Swiss-Prot record:
Pfam families: Methyltransf_25. This is Trans-aconitate 2-methyltransferase. GO terms for biological process: methylation. Its EC number is 2.1.1.144. It is an enzyme of class 2 (transferase). Keywords: Cytoplasm, Methyltransferase, S-adenosyl-L-methionine, Transferase. It comes from Nitrobacter winogradskyi (strain ATCC 25391 / DSM 10237 / CIP 104748 / NCIMB 11846 / Nb-255). Belongs to the methyltransferase superfamily. Tam family. The gene is tam. GO terms for molecular function: trans-aconitate 2-methyltransferase activity. One of its GO terms (cellular component) is cytoplasm. The keyword Transferase applies. The keyword Hydrolase does not apply.
């Protein structure tokens, strides 16, 4: 894919940051010395970590140069590193590995979570959240449009590249032997957005990218036209004209 767009991502900053706040609230650390924000994006989640633990050394890592540029502008004086978590080795003295909405993009992420949790010292925490929305209309219709147009062959891999998350028990069984305690839960958010066009704008920043990034400009326009029409049919307006984007998310907090 092309580089991530921080500007597009931040169009829904409050809604995207809310799961980070909810994840942060469940972390039982009073004074960690070193905190790493994995997949820090434009620094909105990193900012929460800095606010909660101002005395800690907080580091952000991401693969996107544009996201890292925005993070450095947001939090000057903090360290942000361009790195792929699949090949990244955490510092031996890290007390917290925090990951908001990143591991759904990482191949074989359950094995990666085991590796990272196993690298933490006793009492260290791995806290992560992933969208669990591939069965939601917003994402089902991406795959439907990918399979139905003249681009179907080019988009075939993108349409099947992401699998549904494993059942919660699979995460429990994989991580429990590596930690003293583990908490696993789902939260379903219902984001009130202005209209169905806002839903399309939301997913342009994340879920749509593996599809539209492979298309030529005119094809991209046609794909988005068809996708937008399907979204408009699937999400009916509320009494005030807004639409509710149902968004399930999966959380894990594991204490080494």
């Amino acid at each position: 894919m092309d580089d991530w767009s921080a500007e597009q991502y931040l169009k829904f900053e409050d809604e995207r940051t809310r799961p980070s706040r909810d994840l942060l609230a469940q972390i039982p650390l009073s004074a960690p010395r070193k905190v790493v924000d994995i997949g820090c994006g434009p620094g909105n989640s990193t900012e929460l970590l800095v606010a909660r633990w101002p005395q800690a050394e907080v580091i952000g890592i991401d693969t996107s140069a544009d996201m890292l540029r925005r993070a450095r502008e947001r939090l000057p004086g903090y360290t942000f590193i361009e790195a792929n978590v699949a090949h990244w080795v955490p510092p031996a003295d890290a007390d917290l590995l925090f990951a908001n909405a990143i591991f759904q993009w990482v191949p074989d992420h359950l094995r990666q979570l085991q590796r990272l949790l196993g690298a933490l010292p006793s009492g260290g925490v791995l806290a992560m959240q992933m969208p669990d929305n591939l069965d939601e209309p917003s994402h089902v219709m991406m795959r439907e449009v990918a399979h139905s147009g003249p681009w179907r062959e080019r988009l075939a891999e993108a349409a099947r590249a992401k699998d549904l998350l494993a059942r919660p028990g699979a995460y429990y069984d994989a991580l429990r032997p590596l930690c003293e305690r583990i908490e696993i839960w789902h939260t379903v958010y219902n984001h009130a957005l202005e209209d169905t066009a806002a839903i399309v704008e939301w997913v342009k920043g994340t879920g749509l990218r593996p599809f539209v990034d492979l298309l030529e400009p005119m094809e991209r326009k046609e794909f988005l036209r068809e996708y937008t029409a399907r979204v408009a049919a699937a999400y009916q307006p509320q009494a005030d004209g807004k639409v509710l984007l149902r968004f399930p998310r999966f959380f894990v907090v594991a204490i080494r």
